[in-house]
């Protein structure tokens, strides 16, 4: 009866640890020799089944614990603050504000020279000086009443200008003093002769003859003829 009571308590009792079960088994085994009842058949198979069930339950409890941990971990990820890149994407107004500052600086730089030129008090004086320089490009003021005399005066001025340019070219390419002296000895028309008060302009033939003589004295590579 003691063996039956031990097995019944083991079957229908609460699930405990393995050590308690082994102690119960040992107690049942010790009480069985004193009793005359035969041993219960199938106890080994029942014990094996119980062990398998307990192992399955333990695995289930472990798996459920892992699932809870994963759930808590996912919740913790959701509760984490967003990184700076996500904040930049969600709040683009900050970037626009920072980019607008250099654009404003560039616009101010572009507008400063224009406003300075308009508000400058000497702007009118600069215009006057430029216009006077344009008028003085021919080295005299006004126009002669005689159109032929005006044409002759312009032609003489062009000849003298070419002479100056050639003299500069010779000084740059050649350092021969003889050539410089020959060019300097060429006839040069002064500004007084080109003034409107001049009564008799020089003849065309004399100036053309002097120009051809000057071209002969120059270097053969730079000598040119004028067909006028």
UniProtKB/Swiss-Prot annotation:
Q: Where are the sequence repeats?
A: 169-178
Modification after translation (UniProt): Post-translationally modified by JMJD6 lysyl-hydroxylase activity at its Lys-rich domain, which inhibits its self-association and nucleolar localization.
Q: Where is this region: Disordered?
A: 1-108
Acidic residues composition bias: which ranges?
12-24
Tissues in which the protein is found: Highly expressed in spleen, thymus, liver and brown adipose tissue. Moderately expressed in liver, testis and lung.
Q: What highest taxon heads this organism's lineage?
A: Eukaryota
- Listed GO biological process terms: membraneless organelle assembly; protein arginylation
Q: Does the keyword Acetylation apply?
A: no
List localization entries: Nucleus, Nucleolus; Cytoplasm
**Which GO MF terms does the UniProt record name?**
molecular condensate scaffold activity
- Where are the stretches annotated Interaction with ATE1? 113-165
InterPro entries in alphabetical order: LIAT1
Where does the record place Basic and acidic residues bias?
90-108
Region Lysine-rich domain: start and end of each range? 49-71
Question: How does the annotation summarize its subunit structure?
Answer: Self-associates (via Lys-rich domain); targets LIAT1 to the nucleolus. Interacts with ATE1; it is not a substrate of ATE1, the interaction takes place in the cytoplasm and seems to increase ATE1 arginyltransferase activity. Interacts with JMJD6 and MRPS14.
Function text: Participates in nucleolar liquid-liquid phase separation (LLPS) through its N-terminal intrinsically disordered region (IDR). May be involved in ATE1-mediated N-terminal arginylation.
For domains, the record's comment is: The N-terminal intrinsically disordered region (IDR) facilitates its liquid-liquid phase separation (LLPS) in the nucleolus. In the IDR, the lysine-rich domain mediates self-association and targeting to the nucleolus.
PANTHER family according to UniProt: PROTEIN LIAT1 (PTHR36474:SF1)
Its protein name is Protein LIAT1
Organism whose genome encodes this protein: Mus musculus
Gene assigned in the entry: Liat1
């Amino acid at each position: 009866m003691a063996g039956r009571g031990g097995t019944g308590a083991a079957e229908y009792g609460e699930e405990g640890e393995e050590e308690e079960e082994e102690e119960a088994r040992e107690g049942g085994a010790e009480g069985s020799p004193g009793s005359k009842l035969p041993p219960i058949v199938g106890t080994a198979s029942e014990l094996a089944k119980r062990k398998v069930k307990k192992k399955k339950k333990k695995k289930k409890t472990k798996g459920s614990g892992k699932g809870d941990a994963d759930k808590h971990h996912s919740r913790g990820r959701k509760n984490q603050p967003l990184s700076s890149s996500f904040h930049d994407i969600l709040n683009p107004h900050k970037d626009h504000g920072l980019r607008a500052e250099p654009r404003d600086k560039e616009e101010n730089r572009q507008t400063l020279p224009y406003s300075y030129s308009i508000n400058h008090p000497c702007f009118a004086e600069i215009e006057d000086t430029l216009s006077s320089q344009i008028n003085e490009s021919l080295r005299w003021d006004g126009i002669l009443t005689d159109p032929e005399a005006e044409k002759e005066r312009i032609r003489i001025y062009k000849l003298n200008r070419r002479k100056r340019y050639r003299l500069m070219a010779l000084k740059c390419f050649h350092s021969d003093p003889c050539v410089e002296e020959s060019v300097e000895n060429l006839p040069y028309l002064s500004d007084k002769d080109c003034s409107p008060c001049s009564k008799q302009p020089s003849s065309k033939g004399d100036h053309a003859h002097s120009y051809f003589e000057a071209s002969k004295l120059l270097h053969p590579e730079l000598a040119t003829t004028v067909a006028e």
